[in-house]
Amino acid sequence: MTQTLSQLENSGAFIERHIGPDAAQQQEMLNAVGAQSLNALTGQIVPKDIQLATPPQVGAPATEYAALAELKAIASRNKRFTSYIGMGYTAVQLPPVILRNMLENPGWYTAYTPYQPEVSQGRLEALLNFQQVTLDLTGLDMASASLLDEATAAAEAMAMAKRVSKLKNANRFFVASDVHPQTLDVVRTRAETFGFEVIVDDAQKVLDHQDVFGVLLQQVGTTGEIHDYTALISELKSRKIVVSVAADIMALVLLTAPGKQGADIVFGSAQRFGVPMGYGGPHAAFFAAKDEYKRSMPGRIIGVSKDAAGNTALRMAMQTREQHIRREKANSNICTSQVLLANIASLYAVYHGPVGLKRIANRIHRLTDILAAGLLKKGLKLRHAHYFDTLCVEVADKAGVLARAEAGEINLRSDILNAVGITLDETTTRENVMQLFSVLLGDNHGLDIDTLDKDVAHDSRSIQAAMLRDDEILTHPVFNRYHSETEMMRYMHSLERKDLALNQAMIPLGSCTMKLNAAAEMIPITWPEFAELHPFCPPEQAEGYQQMIAQLADWLVKLTGYDAVCMQPNSGAQGEYAGLLAIRHYHESRNEGHRDICLIPASAHGTNPASAHMAGMQVVVVACDKNGNIDLTDLRAKAEQAGDNLSCIMVTYPSTHGVYEETIREVCEVVHQFGGQVYLDGANMNAQVGITSPGFIGADVSHLNLHKTFCIPHGGGGPGMGPIGVKAHLAPFVPGHSVVQIEGMLTRQGAVSAAPFGSASILPISWMYIRMMGAEGLKKASQVAILNANYIASRLQDAFPVLYTGRDGRVAHECILDIRPLKEETGISELDIAKRLIDYGFHAPTMSFPVAGTLMVEPTESESKVELDRFIDAMLAIRAEIDQVKAGVWPLEDNPLVNAPHIQSELVAEWAHPYSREVAVFPAGVADKYWPTVKRLDDVYGDRNLFCSCVPISEYQ
């Protein structure tokens, strides 16, 4: 049969690239589960009353090449001015060896959060290095493995200060008036829901204020002034006030550590260490505190522990602080950090080492000194005598200066009264400084760089003597070895080889949606048109970004059934928080601010109650029935009991149990009947897109995990993106921004993230995914995700019972395998199965969530039938091994499961196990072997002997 030209053009080619099973494989699986077609299977599983009659109109699919060309044309509308705006964002030089071998490498960016440490030792080591950088530069005892951004870290510092404060009756938080405005914005938003009063004043006036539990200072103020706060901090400490200091990571290379000055908490952005500005993100924040406060710290902490053989190994420490365990009592709701960006920053420090970092910092400072000297020589005045990289220059003809800057494609900071701000960075050259002289002084300034350099080299007083660092930094061998590109390349590869990512095997984590992150989707994030824009540049320079964001928002509106989308939240947890704030402010606008009860099903993810608590709500748990569904009788009773105090319900759909609940619309109706709003958690949108939608179901607001459903990679634990979709009545209450108000910013509400559009530079990934898939591809992706999950469930249910099913015994896009009966019968646990899967070359499914003693499997649509069968065969082989234990062939205390995973060194050691080496490391069906580098970790040892910095030099000998 002759094909048409349209068929030969094959605009939907990417759909077949993204979806793992081909048509023949899909039919085989449909036959196996007893369904005639994808539509028939969907019709059986999804409740009829929520099925869309027509798919969302997001356009036809495009090929990878057509989509890239289209997005390139949009990106070209961005204007790449040289930005000296500062305010916590600077241009960088990302070393090409890190760009190519990490940022562009799926071995790094497709990995998951290192909850399974045995398959995560590489990125755990890189994160431990990040913590060591933080400890050395801040002078404190404990560091986290990153937070979402500097402003969020400030809000977390405030919350932590209250937790650890001995002044229990104090309720005021003092913020120095020269912190970055976006930091103050986010702090104020968080303080409102916690009921704190924020005082903003000159730092030296802090002692004039009473009932203050915590203080936020900025070591290098937003307009550039270096502050010596030693005496002030000492006085504050004598009054038992918790002191937090925001610091510049590059300035800390030269400046004294705030911890040495007495600070309790130090934080800042690590963006300057090699991470492009990207119109606001993603960037990792660093966060450090005194040892006595370690159990009150937010975020993940990497600790040094031991494995079963006594070898040094790394793991995430003190996980009992986290939201998935502590729920509303957690230190923070954050479950995504910025691992990929933290690792870029850590490897930037490894590559440059202390000598290289000092050279960079000194060069930036020298050029700033030269610029200052020239301006002073010509009669201009500087607001501050002490500075690192930022000058606040008083100008008589500010409009003229800004006009000349614009003509030279230069951005200066323009929001300072009668002055401009100029922040230099590692990309600044002597030619740039000469251009700045011309902008500020005119072309005939007559200044010479070399002459000025001689003057300032011998007489620089711009950093106070007391503020110069007098201790060594980064003395650990890891920062003093890998400085040639060859060594660095091999070090990074050695780390990558320790980890298991999607480039090696399926990662069947339930509730995580570890789908393909296609190369074509990733390419645009490193385009300079997207990577180099400052988030506070004039709007007319970011027209490409605005077009791309507006188009993506429009698509998401259509896919979710909502009326508006806000892109600011830079993680799913932030999206939850922002959505709940919108509900809170909506109620307040109706004089119903007393509505503060949030209903949450017992099956919910721990982030839900943690977010509700952060939003100032009381959590009331709604029971689930024996089938895992929301108990409608209990829901009605709890809603009626809450009455006029009911704020909302947080519900996940399909449920966290992996089932399309038949009564979801009734749930929405009950909550609306009592004046509440419905927050539908978007974590499981991968089973909704094109089939149903939150808005159609009846919800009022949802966050969308773009790092799940819409293909932003997990990055080993971040970045994420959590934009929120809202119905029209909530649109006026989504986050705004104090610095940037442009079209696309829907409101004047407070911010939840530092940048107006959150992690804007990764939004092209989701844009590309939707553009290449089109409406038909997106629906098919959801359908195949459902098919793959049901295929696994049907083939494994005899060996491992599926805990919850919906109509006709079907599941949604994931299934829960119940290990409890086997554990009771044989003593083999879900943990043993998870670790044994490593020997078979797989990352484990989600363990003990949402039900203890289970494994939750989510295959996604991207995995082929071949890979699904490989996983199924591994699980069936493991079941046969369990039967061997049950039959007494292998003792419970010594068998391949309890000893898993097995490592290479065991093969050449004395072997005393009742099973062979071959059974241990090459079990049935394993051909392409993944080798873990450590055995099972000792979690108890790690938490009892908390050690969160680089291991001693002796470990390298």
Swiss-Prot record:
Residue numbers of N6-(pyridoxal phosphate)lysine PTMs: K708
Citing just one GO molecular function, the answer is: glycine binding
Q: What is its EC number?
A: 1.4.4.2
GO BP terms: namely: glycine decarboxylation via glycine cleavage system
Q: Please indicate if the UniProt record lists Transit peptide as a keyword.
A: no
CDD domains given in the database record: GDC-P
* Similarity comment: Belongs to the GcvP family.
What is the stated purpose of this protein? The glycine cleavage system catalyzes the degradation of glycine. The P protein binds the alpha-amino group of glycine through its pyridoxal phosphate cofactor; CO(2) is released and the remaining methylamine moiety is then transferred to the lipoamide cofactor of the H protein.
Q: Protein name, please?
A: Glycine dehydrogenase (decarboxylating)
Source gene? gcvP
